[in-house]
Amino acid sequence: MSASFSPHTITLIKSTVPLLAEHGTTIIEAMYHRLFEDPQIEALFNQANQKNGTQIHALAGAILAYARNIDNPGVLASAIERISQKHVGYAIHPEHYPHVATALLGAIKQVLGDVATSEVLEAWGEAYWFIANLLKDREAVIREGIMTKNGGWIHWRRFVISKRIPESETITSFMLHPEDGGPVVPHQAGQYLTFRFDAAGMPGMKRNYSISCGPNSDHYRITVKREHGTGASAFLHDQAKVGTIIECTPPVGDFFLPSVIERPIVLLSGGVGLTPMVSMMEQIAEAYPDAQVWYVHGTQNRETHAMDAHIRALVSRHKHMKATTFYTQRSEADDAEAGFITIDWLRANTPFQKADFYLCGPRPFLRTFVRDLIGAGVPAAQVHYEFFGPMDEEMAA
């Protein structure tokens, strides 16, 4: 990834870094206010992340990081891939980018005032369209790859809930088949679906849920924890029945197993973060008989532990697969380790520096293990993780 920005453009962008550090969130708030004057544009965004401020904070941090690295945009390659995958999931298309450009530049002028000269705005316009064109090009490649496969689709597609499976006291799995009776594009184990819910009280609400079954052309399975409140998880748990229709876009995401497994694999999850791991384990059990796999999961207790019997069955089918569970509230009868997963335990019981780690779980879980694994000597390129919600600068680092 290389950019042909002039030295003058680079100087202008870098001159705004202190202002972005101070006023970045205000600029992004103003940008979204402008964008959301158009209801069709507003409907593209996850409003929950708008209301709690996480998206505003994350985007402000991303723009600041871009400004600081304007002379070395190659450091943003992984972010470009993650955002492109997310945009395909949210059905964002090339025609939406000019709206963002107008809103962003208008917000910069509104917040920075006279400091945002015509030269500064021109430089930021150039910087925006450089990134926007990278995203559009990558998104086009992703969509083409989906559409060339049997069962592929691009926009929102209607699925029928064909089965509900209680997995724990707070977690339920939902089997999904296309309403049109056609095939589905096989996902890569670890990817997710983006859903649009139009039930009463949450029009246009969007959520990402990892696919929790192995790749196939017939159906998907998602496994959802009942969260507090009245959002998508409450709708699925309390209102969605067998026969209920829900809409989603095709599987996307940059968190998945490689086509060729060259190193031992450690799957590490916390709570409902087990969902992409189950998908990976199903694929490994089916297609990678020689892969060496350690699955380590942490949860509160037996009542909160989802899919335990299914995971044990997968382990029994594969001669090189091991699974260990940690309960923070363990009883004497539980076949689990007591307490929390630790780096010392992983170092002693897995291949560690020789392994590829795949992580999914709550934000504190990920922040701790991404940082500590790398700090303990696992190469950063061997630490892969999935996080739902806007990625803050600390996580992205």
UniProtKB/Swiss-Prot annotation:
EC number, UniProt record: 1.14.12.17
Residue ranges annotated for the FAD-binding FR-type domain, each copy included: 154-258
Annotated keywords: Detoxification, FAD, Flavoprotein, Heme, Iron, Metal-binding, NAD, NADP, Oxidoreductase, Oxygen transport, Transport
Annotated PROSITE patterns: FAD_FR (PS51384), GLOBIN (PS01033)
Gene Ontology molecular function: FAD binding; heme binding; metal ion binding; nitric oxide dioxygenase NAD(P)H activity; oxygen binding; oxygen carrier activity
Catalyzed reactions: 2 nitric oxide + NADPH + 2 O2 = 2 nitrate + NADP(+) + H(+); 2 nitric oxide + NADH + 2 O2 = 2 nitrate + NAD(+) + H(+)
Family, per entry: Belongs to the globin family. Two-domain flavohemoproteins subfamily.
Protein name per UniProt: Flavohemoprotein
Encoding gene per record: hmp
